[in-house]
Curated annotation (Swiss-Prot):
Residues 1-95 are annotated as: Winged HTH domain. Residues 1-15 have a biased composition (Basic and acidic residues). Residues 156-200 are annotated as: Probable ligand-binding region. Transcriptional regulator of a CBASS antivirus system. CBASS (cyclic oligonucleotide-based antiphage signaling system) provides immunity against bacteriophage. The CD-NTase protein synthesizes cyclic nucleotides in response to infection; these serve as specific second messenger signals. The signals activate a diverse range of effectors, leading to bacterial cell death and thus abortive phage infection. A type III CBASS system. Binds specifically to and represses expression from the CBASS promoter, found between the genes for divergently transcribed capW and cdnC (cognate DNA). Homodimer. PANTHER family: PROTEIN PAFB (PTHR34580:SF3), PTHR34580. Residues 1-21 are annotated as: Disordered. This is DNA-binding transcriptional repressor CapW. Residues 208-299 are annotated as: WCX domain. Changing residue 245 to A: Almost complete loss of induction by bacteriophage lambda, increased resistance to lambda, constitutive repressor. The lineage of its organism: Bacteria, Pseudomonadati, Pseudomonadota, Gammaproteobacteria, Enterobacterales. Keywords: Antiviral defense, DNA-binding, Repressor, Transcription, Transcription regulation.
Length: 299
């Protein structure tokens, strides 16, 4: 089984190679990130992470100062550059979303040295995840079929057929529903596009070109607007709280979702037709255009 390795792992042994691969723009992103989230940076931060020389680190800091002169000031007593009150991030990689995602990766897989720009970090934890078995060779074959517009012969297991049976699929995309990986594919047995769990594909072999079916998934290519509101059964103060939680505009959130993925989204939001009968305090959100959405799910 291949090692679970990402760029940036085992940094102590790869500093020189990172420095060779990553140009100055990447190092400027690093400076921006560390100033935003650590509040400070010095030359050794750059030399340690990228394996570059001290003179090169000085040049990078000088270049960043030209780029955003109001973002940092030099503290002579500590010999570090500190972010100022006027700091405004230059790069999207310094966003709160990116930073929290970096922390989440550390919490989910603490045994892996994640290749992010994290310096000091708060203690962080995440609820354990159940990971499904994935066969590298199977996933590789599915990806090849997607790339080359080909069909694949597979053995697929399901709750109704736990031993597995032969099927021919023409996959066109991968899907993550928030919990599991699927491939979206034309099922030659059923004569329709369906989702197939990658963990339940036991074998996959090339079955030749099938470009026509690889591009004809109407439900995949159709985008549906979902309008979310604070649940009308909540009191005014509670609705205001929910609207602030989700940064609603005029009391609404507008999402676009592929029609083929609607059920997954509603399940995560606790808003399927079955789930929607719970107490308002449990649901918190509601579908403003629920009649339209539930009708689409029945198609």
């Amino acid at each position: 089984m291949p090692d679970n390795f990402r760029e940036g792992d085992k940094q102590d042994s790869q500093k020189g190679r990172q420095g060779a691969r990553w140009g100055q723009e990447r190092r400027l992103e690093f400076i921006d990130y560390r100033l935003r989230w650590d509040g400070q940076i010095n030359r050794s931060s750059l030399t340690d992470f990228f394996g570059i020389s001290v003179p090169q680190a000085s040049l990078d800091l000088s270049e960043y100062t030209k780029l955003a002169p109001d973002n940092l000031e030099y503290d002579m007593s500590s010999r570090v550059y500190r972010s100022t009150k006027l700091f405004q991030p230059v790069y999207m990689t310094s966003s709160l979303e990116c930073y929290l995602n970096d922390l989440l990766q550390v919490a989910i897989q603490p045994e892996i040295h994640f290749g992010s720009f994290l310096g000091w970090r708060s203690p962080v934890a995440a609820v354990p995840r159940l990971l499904r078995r994935l066969d590298t060779d199977v996933v590789s074959q599915i990806l090849r079929a997607i790339r080359e517009n080909e069909a694949v012969h597979v053995i697929y297991q399901s709750m109704s057929d736990p031993q597995g049976s032969k099927r021919t699929l023409t996959p066109h995309s991968l899907v993550h529903d928030g919990y599991r990986w699927h491939t979206r594919a034309w099922c030659h047995k059923r004569g329709e596009y369906r989702d197939f769990l990658l963990s339940r594909i036991v074998q996959a072999q090339n079955a030749g070109p099938d470009e026509e079916r690889a591009n004809g998934d109407l439900a995949w290519n159709t985008f549906i607007k979902i309008i979310l509101i604070a649940h009308p059964g909540l009191c005014l103060a509670q609705r205001n709280l929910i609207e602030r939680d989700y940064a609603m505009i005029d009391g609404e959130i507008h999402l676009e979702c592929r029609q083929a993925l609607l059920h997954y989204l509603l399940f995560q939001l606790n808003l399927t037709e079955t789930q929607s009968h719970q107490a308002p305090e449990a649901l918190q959100l509601a579908l403003k255009n629920k009649d339209e959405i539930y009708a689409l799910l029945k198609q």
